[in-house]
C-alpha cells in the first residue's frame, strides 16, 4: 500500500507512511507467528465460499470479516508484495476524522468479537488479537493518561526513590514534545523528532474520541475524509 506523492501531501503523507510501515511490520510478525490480525480493505482477497455478510451498521467490515474467517481456523496471510495506491488525508483534521472512525470501529469490533477474547478456545489467535488490537483500542489510551497523575503521586509519596522522579521527567518531556509537535504541525513546520510523541498522542486521543463517536452514531455510515 502506498499513498499518492504527486499531490503534495507533505507532513500528513509522512505520518501516514511511517505509521503504515510500522503496521505492516506488525502484520508480518503476526503472520509469521500464526496469522495476521485484520486486513486492509483495498488489499484483501478471500475465497468466495468464506465470505459472509456483516451487520449493516458495521464500521470496519474488512477487519470483522477477516477475523471471523480466522476464527474458523483459516490463516490470514500477509503478502508484502501486494500493492495498492491511494491518496492520503488532505490534512490532519481529515486524518483525525479517519482515526476517530477507525477507533470507533475497533471498539465496536471488540464488543462483537468478544468470543475471540477466550484464549482457551482460540489460543495464539486470541493472544495476537488482544495484544495487537484490543489493548490498543481499550486499555492503552486510558492507561496513557492515568500514568501522569499516578506518577506524580509516586513522586510525592516516595521521596526516597528518585527513579520515579526520573520517569516523571521523561514522561513530561514526551507529552510536552507531543504538544510542541502539534503546534509546529499547525504551522506546517517539520520536525521528525517531535513527530513520534505528537502522532502517538494524536492517535490515542482519537481512540477516546472514537468511544464517544460510537455512542452517538448507531449506523455504519460515516463522513468520508477528504483526500489530498
Identify the residue ranges that each predicted region occupies.
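Catalytic donor/gating beta->alpha subdomain of glycosyltransferases that bind UDP-sugars
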Residues: 1, 15-23, 57-61, 66-132, ...
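Conserved nucleotide-sugar donor-binding
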Residues: 40-53
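Juxtamembrane C-terminal module of membrane proteins
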Residues: 93-94, 115-125, 172-228
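A residue-level structural signature of the nucleotidyltransferase/glycosyltransferase Rossmann-like core
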Residues: 36, 42-43, 75-76
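Short coil/turn segments at secondary-structure boundaries
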Residues: 37-40, 112-113, 118, 145
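Single conserved hydrophobic/aromatic residue that forms the stacking wall/gate
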Residues: 2-13
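Alpha-helical bilayer-embedded segments of polytopic membrane proteins, i.e.
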Residues: 125-184, 195-206
Amino acid at each position: 500500500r502506498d499513498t499518492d506523492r504527486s499531490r503534495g501531501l507533505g507532513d500528513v503523507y509522512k505520518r501516514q507512511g511511517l505509521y503504515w510501515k510500522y503496521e505492516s511490520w506488525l502484520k508480518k510478525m503476526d503472520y509469521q507467528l500464526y496469522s495476521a490480525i485484520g486486513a486492509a480493505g483495498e488489499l484483501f482477497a478471500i475465497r468466495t465460499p468464506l465470505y459472509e455478510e456483516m451487520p449493516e451498521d458495521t464500521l470496519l467490515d474488512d477487519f470483522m470479516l477477516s477475523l471471523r474467517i480466522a476464527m474458523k481456523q483459516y490463516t490470514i496471510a500477509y503478502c508484502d508484495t501486494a500493492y495498492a495506491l491511494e491518496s492520503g488525508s488532505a490534512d490532519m483534521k481529515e486524518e483525525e476524522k479517519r482515526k476517530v472512525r477507525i477507533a470507533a470501529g475497533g471498539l465496536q469490533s471488540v464488543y462483537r468479537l468478544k468470543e475471540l477474547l477466550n484464549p482457551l478456545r482460540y489460543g495464539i489467535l486470541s493472544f495476537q488479537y488482544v495484544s495487537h488490537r484490543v489493548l490498543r483500542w481499550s486499555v492503552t489510551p486510558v492507561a496513557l493518561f492515568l500514568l501522569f497523575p499516578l506518577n506524580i503521586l509516586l513522586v510525592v509519596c516516595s521521596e526516597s526513590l528518585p527513579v520515579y522522579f526520573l520517569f516523571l521527567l521523561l514522561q513530561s518531556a514526551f507529552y510536552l514534545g507531543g504538544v510542541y509537535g502539534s503546534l509546529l504541525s499547525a504551522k506546517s513546520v517539520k520536525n521528525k523528532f517531535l513527530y513520534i510523541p505528537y502522532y502517538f498522542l494524536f492517535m490515542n486521543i482519537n481512540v477516546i474520541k472514537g468511544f464517544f463517536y460510537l455512542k452517538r452514531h448507531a449506523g455504519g455510515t460515516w463522513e468520508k475524509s477528504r483526500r489530498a
